[in-house]
Amino acid sequence: MEEYQVYLELDGYQQYDFLYPLLFREYIYALAHDYALNRSRISLENGTYDNKSSSLSVKRLITRMYQRIPLSISTNDSNQNQFFGHNNNLYSQMISEGFAVIVEIPFSLRLVSFLEGKEIEKSHNFQSIHSIFPFFEDKFSHLNYVLDVLIPHPIRPEILVQTLRYWVKDAPFLHLLRFFLHEYFNWNSLITRKKSISIFSKSNPRLFLFLYNSHVCEYESILLFLRNQSSHLRSTSSGIFLERIYFYRKVEHLVQVLANDFQDILWLFKDPFMHYVRYQGKSILASKDRPLVMNKWKYYLIHLWQWHFHMWSEPGRVHIKHFYKHSINCLGYLFSVRLNPLVVRSQMLENSFIIDNAMKKFDTTVPIIPLIGSLTKARFCNTLXHPISKPTRADSSDSHIIDRFVRICRNLSHYHSGSSKKKSLYRIKYILRLSCVKSLVRKHKNTVRAFLKRLGSEFVEEFLTEEEHVLSLIFPRASSTSRRLYRGRIWYLDIFCINDLVNHE
């Protein structure tokens, strides 16, 4: 990879047709199975390649796509449809993997070189989802209003292709990608008209997640540029995504015009307390400013999507919420800022005063209703949250069934360990524990009381989380101390993905 690094580096003011010649070289297809790119400390992918994605098959299929062989594909979404004489899902996944490898190579190299130039510490702890929550706790407790934004998604593949024009100045490759996306759009297997962010198929996540993120980064770069005009602490983590051809010239000209003619409008963007966070298909824009300014931001985002990115967005997709009156659903938690009244009695000479203070506290709770809905879909309980028996295989052993429920329970407890109120978490653990018992009772055709009597306390100990075991070992005689520490919020730096039950959105 080092010998190709100089060749693949992009110059923002020149045009390099780097992807087109690489499509016809042998080594580019082998990169799909080469882990040299993955051995770097920074990786842009969420998983590994499928062994079925043969580099030779990818090469042949891309070559036949260039030859424009007529396709005979029915309109029905079926796995039996033939794509170049082969199974649709299998070979479309091969092609998408080939596209993803080719597109990600220059961006991976530029990202690594960017981080080396900035001397940013490459710690794996920064990849943890829980590392975001201390930032919320430190910053959001001083803010007043928040924009809860549901990001619109492009329903036409042409919008995704146009987004890449700022990154890739290679017409043949863009035409090939456009042809591939339009064929998928006709099959209605990867891109659909659903409202959720799950418009991309789970079997082909890499390429389409890259396209979606690059599309969202287009409008985020504008927001970040305007945000940094008034901030002394410039953002560096997203600096690699801000490199656009003629982008800074356009925005600087826009800011100059606004500064000369519309001083009040420019003041909208000069907010040093503005914080932006994006997760899945939503984003949060929090500020300490007044509701009028937040309303301006709302309609600014809507017009930016509609007129600049050609995406229809309704005003109802952007909600203005007061932090002290509403909660924000983010990453499986409900965030809110609670005002705790504090009465202090002060005495000066013969006069005494009573001072009322309101202390702000950042509150994190478990969204019990959506989580019970996820347990209902997974058939752990009914709609009323009453535990039910989950069907199991006849040849499954009791230890295997218990280990499965214990693993689910510990993962949920591990992820929601930062909750300030553990009662909801205890209820979820109770549902899983009793569902496990009913599943075993159903298998052995016994009663719940008789089964629990036979297992005893060993069954309950299986569901204890790791932190409970550790605290009980540290404080064996001070049970109240360990109980108080466990009830507090605990953030972990080893959580890299959201559990399927937590990801109920």
UniProtKB/Swiss-Prot annotation:
It is found in: Plastid, Chloroplast. GO terms for molecular function: RNA binding. The keyword RNA-binding applies. Keywords: Chloroplast, mRNA processing, Plastid, RNA-binding, tRNA processing. GO terms for biological process: mRNA processing; RNA splicing; tRNA processing. It holds the Pfam family MatK_N. One of its GO terms (cellular component) is chloroplast. Its main location: plastid. The keyword Chloroplast applies. Usually encoded in the trnK tRNA gene intron. Probably assists in splicing its own and other chloroplast group II introns. PANTHER family: MATURASE K. Belongs to the intron maturase 2 family. MatK subfamily. This is Maturase K. It comes from Pleiogynium timoriense.
